[in-house]
UniProtKB/Swiss-Prot annotation:
PANTHER family: TRANS-ACONITATE 2-METHYLTRANSFERASE, TRANS-ACONITATE 2-METHYLTRANSFERASE-RELATED. Signal peptide: none annotated. Gene3D superfamilies: S-adenosyl-L-methionine-dependent methyltransferases, Vaccinia Virus protein VP39. GO terms for biological process: methylation. This is Trans-aconitate 2-methyltransferase. It is found in: Cytoplasm. Keywords: Cytoplasm, Methyltransferase, S-adenosyl-L-methionine, Transferase. GO terms for molecular function: trans-aconitate 2-methyltransferase activity. It comes from Methylobacterium radiotolerans (strain ATCC 27329 / DSM 1819 / JCM 2831 / NBRC 15690 / NCIMB 10815 / 0-1). It catalyses: trans-aconitate + S-adenosyl-L-methionine = (E)-3-(methoxycarbonyl)pent-2-enedioate + S-adenosyl-L-homocysteine. Catalyzes the S-adenosylmethionine monomethyl esterification of trans-aconitate. Pfam families: Methyltransf_12.
Amino acid sequence: MADWNPALYTRFEDERTRPAAELLARVPLEAPRLAIDLGCGPGNSTALIAARFPDAEVIGLDTSPAMLESARARLPRLAFALADAATWTPERAPDLIYANAVLQWLPDHATLLPRLFGLLAPGGVLAVQMPDNLAEPTHRLMRAVAASGPWAAAIGDPAVAGRLGRMLEPAAYYDLLAPAAAEVDVWRTAYHHRMADAAAIVDWVRATGLRPFLDPLDPEHRAGFLDAYTRAIDGAYPPRSDGRRLLAFPRVFVVARKAS
């Protein structure tokens, strides 16, 4: 895929940061020495970690040069580096591996999450938050529109572009981590974000889930796809009593602590 667009991503920064803050609030650590923000994006979550743990060494990692540039501009005193969560191995064991809205992009969670948990120092915590919205209208309509227009061949299999089959049920994450953990906390929350109109909902997903559908398209097909998708979204998210739209957005949270 093309590189991420930090400006588009941060257009809804308050809404995107809320689950990051709620994940961090459930981390059962007092004074970690080394905290890794895995998939740090533009640094909004890294700033939360640094504020809560001011004495910790906090390092942000991401695969996107554009996101890392934005994070460094936001937090010039912190360290950021290019790294892939699928293969990353730390030089020394972290006390906190914090992965907010990143692991949903990666396959094989049955291997990935236990691997990350195993990298922790004794007493360390793996904290994960992942969107769980592939069954929501935003994502069902991505796949439907992708399969039905002149852009279908360029996009390919909508199930692949839509990352179907990667997310597990919340209880499965518990089962993966509980045998090796001192404590595992798993929960699922559905946020309902107030959006101005259908175009705002499209802008939200253009920064994230819509990228694998749009990136392969030439400008003409991209415009046509967005027009068809926006019309579909307009029908799926009708105006509420104040004229706004409500975007339902489920997320899964996992916090696992290693024995000391």
